[in-house]
């Protein structure tokens, strides 16, 4: 990454000098499936903890086994690093009474931060009865949790339109959400328009951009298809012919993410949320470069 570091060093330094507050980051992990992936996860956790993030978060499955695994990983990460670690909590396959018991259990066991989400549908026939807004309301009734919620610069796959997403986010903010973390994106203008729209609609919480590192373009296309995230044409051109060259893909992907973060810095963004995929190498390099 030295060649990229040299190119951006002066620009970034000037930008950092103009920031009144320290730039901060948060990192998202998912529970490991086996001992080998668990070792890799905690190796990444330790590495990224050196950046002193304001938050770690751990994703969450709908069944009880996955919930217990999330709780275990959250507690172990916090014990190992001392960094605030938030479990994701979703509404899928859970009643309000079950969610209430989980939230009480979390609070009684020292967890003060939660990422409150509706959750993805397990199948096409599934009908949601409880939504993220309901969960935010429930959490605030139980205790003064610090709550992060989701936001969608390029429209949630199930939303009617962009304004519907904005109104839903405003309801969550008004109900007590402390911040919103966006779905990942590659068109920075989408995030900036969304942020402006939030301001126009009096959404008075921070809209933290979600940043996804690029390791494998085929994998990225699958992620984007599932989440309704658009990939610009120029990205397809950049990765053309590199299907078997993952090392070059990683270098190009790092450059793309660097440009996204750099542009957001110039637009006044000070907090970033990284979807780590339980890896640390690229993210650590990028964050270190920007003084995070």
UniProtKB/Swiss-Prot annotation:
Keyword Acetylation among UniProt keywords: no
Question: Which SUPFAM superfamilies has this protein been placed in?
Answer: FAD-linked oxidoreductase (SSF51730)
Q: Where does FAD bind?
A: 60, 62, 88, 118-120, 132, 152, 156, 165, 168, 171-172
Pathway, per Swiss-Prot/TrEMBL?
One-carbon metabolism; tetrahydrofolate interconversion; Amino-acid biosynthesis; L-methionine biosynthesis via de novo pathway
Q: Name one GO cellular component term.
A: cytosol
Q: What residues bind NADH, as annotated? A: 59, 183
What residues sit in the active site? Answer: 28
User: Is-annotated flag, keyword Signal?
Assistant: no
Q: So where does (6S)-5-methyl-5,6,7,8-tetrahydrofolate get bound?
A: 120, 183, 219, 279
Its EC top class is oxidoreductase
Q: For this UniProt record, give its keywords in alphabetical order, as a comma-separated list.
A: Amino-acid biosynthesis, FAD, Flavoprotein, Methionine biosynthesis, NAD, Oxidoreductase
- Which coenzymes or cofactors are required? FAD
Q: What is its EC number?
A: 1.5.1.54
Q: Which reaction does it catalyse?
A: (6S)-5-methyl-5,6,7,8-tetrahydrofolate + NAD(+) = (6R)-5,10-methylene-5,6,7,8-tetrahydrofolate + NADH + H(+)
Sample GO molecular function, one term? FAD binding
> What processes does the entry annotate via GO biological process terms?
methionine biosynthetic process; tetrahydrofolate interconversion
Under the heading Pfam families, the entry gives: MTHFR
Q: Which family does it belong to?
A: Belongs to the methylenetetrahydrofolate reductase family.
Protein name, entry field: 5,10-methylenetetrahydrofolate reductase
- Coding gene? metF
């Amino acid at each position: 990454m030295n060649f990229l570091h040299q190119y951006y060093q002066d620009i970034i330094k000037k930008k950092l000098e103009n920031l009144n507050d320290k730039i901060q980051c948060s990192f998202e992990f998912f529970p490991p499936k086996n001992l080998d992936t668990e070792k890799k996860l905690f190796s990444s956790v330790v590495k990224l903890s050196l950046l002193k993030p304001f938050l770690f978060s751990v994703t969450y499955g709908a069944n009880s086994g996955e919930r217990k695994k999330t709780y275990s990983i959250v507690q172990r990460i916090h014990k190992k690093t001392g960094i605030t670690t938030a479990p994701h909590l979703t509404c899928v396959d859970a009643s309000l009474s079950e969610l209430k018991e989980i939230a009480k259990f979390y609070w009684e066991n020292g967890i003060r931060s939660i990422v409150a989400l509706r959750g993805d549908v397990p199948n096409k026939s599934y009908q949601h009865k409880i939504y993220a807004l309901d969960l935010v309301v429930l959490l605030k009734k139980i205790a003064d949790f610090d709550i992060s919620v989701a936001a969608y610069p390029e429209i949630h796959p199930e939303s009617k339109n962009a304004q519907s997403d904005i109104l839903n986010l405003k309801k969550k903010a008004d109900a007590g959400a402390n911040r919103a973390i966006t779905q990942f994106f590659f068109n920075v203008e989408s995030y900036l328009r969304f942020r402006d729209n939030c301001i126009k609609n009096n959404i008075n919480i921070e809209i933290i951009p979600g940043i996804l590192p690029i390791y494998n373009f085929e994998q990225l296309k699958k992620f984007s298809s599932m989440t309704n995230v658009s990939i610009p044409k120029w990205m397809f051109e950049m990765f053309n012919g590199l299907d078997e060259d993952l090392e070059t893909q990683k270098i190009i992907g790092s450059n793309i993410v660097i440009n996204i973060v750099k542009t957001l810095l110039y637009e006044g963004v000070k907090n970033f949320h990284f979807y780590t995929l339980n890896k640390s190498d690229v993210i650590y390099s990028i964050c270190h470069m920007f003084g995070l």
